[in-house]
Amino acid sequence: MMRLWGRKNSINVQKILWCLLELGLHEGKDFERIDAGLQFGKNHTPEFLKLNPNGLVPTLEDGDMALWESNTIMRYLARTHDRNHHFPTDIKSQYHSEKWMDWHLSDMWPQLRAAFLGLTRVPEAERNYDIIRKNYQDSNLKFAVLDQVLCGQKYCSGSQFHLGDIVLALCVHRWILLNKTFPEKTGPRTQLIHIDNWMQRITEETLFNEIADKELNIVVR
């Protein structure tokens, strides 16, 4: 049985959990999940560091192989466990999805992550709200790029749901939650109709609601 290390409220662990659900794989039946990271600890023990020397979650064990990096784990699961061809396998769809997964890491996530950490991990007395606001507003610009593409297609890689949609939808959800939770600190969230429509499809046609946070995990206030 596969073993997934990571807490459910980690956005990177949520990617894996959502992917597993879409593949028809369920916790306790098809894989074991161990809470790790933040309040659960365990990710800096000698046992864990043998699996992932970075000491980060998620980490996946499958037989004698250990994988880290959430996007890599999703690619592996889709390649090895998608027996019913849930995700498209044609080259065009595959690499459009890959493109968005890479864009998320290099262009979009850094600003959103900085705003999130600034508001949920840094004590209030130490927060730089000017930088937090700038990072959030820069995220608005990044999401406008995605919105423009979704104007002409149903999902990020074309007509079918793919791994890239998992990555991006979780980030859009966090972008929305940040503004709902800290509206005065983030500044306004740009209204992007094509992203709104895409998220509506995601909630209606996929298993997003089973793993998505209802509120932010705020560690410090």
Question: What kind of feature is each model-predicted range?
Answer:
Residues 50, 204, 213:
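Phosphate-coordinating loops and pocket residues in cytosolic domains that bind phosphorylated ligands
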Residues 208-221:
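C-terminal helix/juxtamembrane-tail motif
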Residues 24, 55, 153-154, 206:
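Structural motif
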Residues 1-133:
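GST-like domain detector, emphasizing the conserved glutathione-binding G-site
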Residues 78, 171-172, 212:
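Active-site-flanking alpha-helical
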Residues 92, 96, 100-204:
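GST-like fold's C-terminal all-alpha helical module
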